[in-house]
Structure formats: C-alpha cells, structure tokens
Amino acid sequence: MHNFWYLPVFLKWMLSTNAYCQAPPEDSATLQEPEIGRSSIDSFPTRTDHASHDLSICADSPQDASTSPSCASYLHFSLLQEEYLISSFFDIVQDANPIFSKERFLRRYHSSLCSQDLILTMAIITAKLTQFAGYDDGKHLDAGLDSLLSSSLLDDDLIGDAPSLDQFRKAYLLAFYEFHQFPGHHSWLRIGRVTRMAYRIGLDRLDYIRVLYSDWSTVSDEDIHEWRALWWRIYRLDTYSNLASGTPYLIDDVVINTSFTLRRTEDDLSQEIFLPFNSDGLSEILPSITSDTETLLNNIHTVTIATMRKAGLVIRMHLLRWQDGIVAQVANVERQLATLRLALPLGWLNLRRNAFANEKPVDHHARLITVFHLRMAQLLLSVVECGQRRADDWLSSWQRILEACQDIASLAGQWDSAFCLTVDPAITFTIFTALIFLHLQRKSNTISDESVRSSINHDITVLHLQLKHFGSIWTQARLLTLSFESFSESVSGPLAYSHINLILSRFEAPLHPRWLQFLSSARSALEDLQ
C-alpha cells in the first residue's frame, strides 16, 4: 500500500493507482474496518483478491447453494445467534433490502428453504453493522466478510443464465455493502456486473418475459414479487453509484417493462404500475401508487430516485460542456420536479413527523429520504444553471444554490441519528455536496448580512454532524467527512465570482476523482486567480 502522510490523507490515498482500495500485504488474510484518522493511512480498508471458490450456485434447490468453504471453516454462529441476526437484518438499511416479504422469507428460513450462502451473508453484514457483541472479538467476522467479498466475484457467483433468487440477493447485498464500506473501483465494477446480469436474465422485463418463456412462466406470483423488488433495488444502486461517480447509468429508464411492487389481491383488477417512458409522466402514476398504502413509501422512493436520475443526466451534459440546450434541459427537469412535488400526497414534504396521521418515526425518516432526493435534484440543477451564467447575471442562480442547500439542511435538522442504520447511506452524497456549496456560500463576498452568515454556519454544523453520524457506521461517509473538513480548512475566502465560477466549472460529481482532487488542491487553484 502506498503511504501519504500529508493532508488530505484520504484523497491522496483514494486517487492512487487502485482508486480507493489497495491490496494488503501478503500475510494479511482478513479485511479490517478502519479507525480513520488524518495521518493513519495504513488503517484504511483493504480487500484481498483471492482465487474464486467453485460454488454450485445454479441449482434449483437451496441445498445446492451451500456455504462458502472458507467461511464455514471458521464461522460458527449458534442457532440462536443466527436467528437473532437474520431477524435484525430487517431493521437495517430498509430501503436497500432486496427482500419484499419479511414474513414469507422468515417462514422459508425456519423451514430451511433458504440458501445457506445468503443466510451467512445476511448474518455477517448484520453483525458487522450492528457491532454484534455476541460473537468473539470480531476477527472471525472480518475474515468471513473478507472471504465473501474476495471469493464472490460475480462471474463465478452468477454463472449460467438462471441464478437462483437467493444467489442474486447475495450478490446484490455484497455489492451494496462493498460500495459503502470498502469504496473503490472493485465495488463500482461489482455493481456493474450485478446490473448487467440482471439484464441478462431479464429482470428489466419481467412482465413481458414471463409470458414468453416457460422457465419464468412457472415462477410463482410470490417469487415474481421478490424478483421485482430486487430489480428496483438494483435500479437504486445503479443510480447512486453512477450519479456519485459521474458515470453514465447502466439502466435505461425508457425501456423497463418490470412493474412496481404492489400487494395486490386476486380480486384487485387494477393495472400494474410501470415507470413511464416519458419522465413527465412520473406524477401521473402517483395516484395509483398512493392507493396501496403498504408499498407507498417504497414506490415513492423509486419515483424520487427516477427524478434524481434526470438531474444526473443534466449533470452529464454539464460534464461534456454541451452549451446548446442545457438551459432548456434544466428548465424541463425543474418543471417535472414542480409537478411531482404538487402531486405528492398531502403533507409529504412536511419536515416534521405527521403525528396526526400516526406516522411512525421509522416511516418519517423513510419519507425524509425521498424529500432528500428531490432537494438533491434541485441542487444539481441549480449548480448546472449557475455554471452557465456570466458575471453580470449569476447572482440569482447563486442564490438558488443557497436555497437548495438550506432546504437540505432543514431536512437534516429533523434527523434522528438513531435512524442512520435504518436507511441507505447513499444520502451522504447529498449531505456532502450541500456542505461543500454551503462553505462556498459563507466564504463568498455576496454574503454581507451577518444573520444570513450565522444561519449558514448553523446549517453547516447540522449537516456536518449528520455526516459524522453516518461515518460512525460507514467508511464512505467517514471519507466524505474528511474531504469536507480538509476543504473547509483550505478555502478561507473571500471568494469572488471568478473563484466560484472556477469551482463550478470543476464540479463533475460528488465522488468523481477529478472533483475530489480539485477539492484537495483548491487553495492553490484559487490563489492563482488573485
């Protein structure tokens, strides 16, 4: 591993040859979660590139998908421990959980009908994230997780054309976990493989392929629900990973023929709900979505993700420096945002818990995540628009960036850190982006009112604390925290239009290597403009 002992430590490490993840010394066999510090590069997460294990994963029965030999040799959860961890799994990262029906899954689990490989993966991830105290000193968990990540390359895990549902769930969970806990090009590539395999077997067209092919026509309605849920989780992961990295989405929204997950009865003749070909139609499917209260949160989450994807496409145009039509594209997506906000159920954008509606705290936070998506979309659009303005007409657009960041900070002000583990930590990309632009706002020479500056400082404090709470669980969030702290220390201001315009021109994506590299050297770049 390369060592860099000067600030910002993690940026130098992240931009080295292997992006984020470096191979450990040959005598290192386990994957340790780090205690990250500014001068402790050796403690950053690593993973080993072990040879793949041969697993019988294309079988039809769960018994054929046995536990990875390297894991089974040293991981021995007792039955009570395993049952506790599997039950607890449904309390964490709920909006990223690929299992549609908890009750059905637990029935199958207690009947020994689930793949032991999947059960082991769920148990290890739950134990790691919840700091499960009932299992030795954690070394065996680290070794088991290392084995799962290094021996579960997708080309081996999902070999053949028809991997089982449990095998695909396992592959998804590992891709999700690695992306947030051991970020880097390995995790990004793993997500890409999962997404492409989903296309290969037809998850993007479940409602069409089921009619044509016998192997899908015999799948039960309950299992089809589970496959649908898995597809839309992959859709979210494709969104987060590529939007954060500034790379094109692998999934094409225009050609998806897999309906949303709904709890329909046989007597319910309502039509299934599909992602509209035209993004203008997102608001039109909301009445059908809201009619199914059990899946309401889940499906609106997907709709707001789809909206955020549209803003990401505009960012791609910004990356390519396409001047023609970009302002019109910004206006078009903003119209879609406005329509969607108005079409949402009454009180959906309320920052506080809807107590009169008996909204549970966990549902309140799940709803807040969808509002974060909408605010992030607005922030991205505002950044692009501001970058198109000249010195004589940029202030109104610069103010809109502040408005979007303040809206995000208002959401953070209602956040209970106890729920950081219950949601997808991809929200940290939004928090980080808002922090960067709030710092630029407070250092710009456009802010003369001390009360406004004080409000901005408060917003930064709230968002910084929220990011640190996520960082107590996830490596990705810890790295983003370090990035913001380093950037805020290096850029002192006051910043004029020329400085801000330079920074806006360099913005590509929250985790794009060139953007992070620029943040690490922003002081010298800004001083050159003096």
Model-derived features with residue positions:
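Charge-rich, intrinsically disordered regulatory segments
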Residues: 1-116, 137, 228, 272, ...
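C-terminal, low-complexity intrinsically disordered regions in eukaryotic proteins
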Residues: 5-6, 21-22, 444-445, 451-530
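Long, charge-rich low-complexity segments
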Residues: 162-182, 351-352, 359, 369, ...
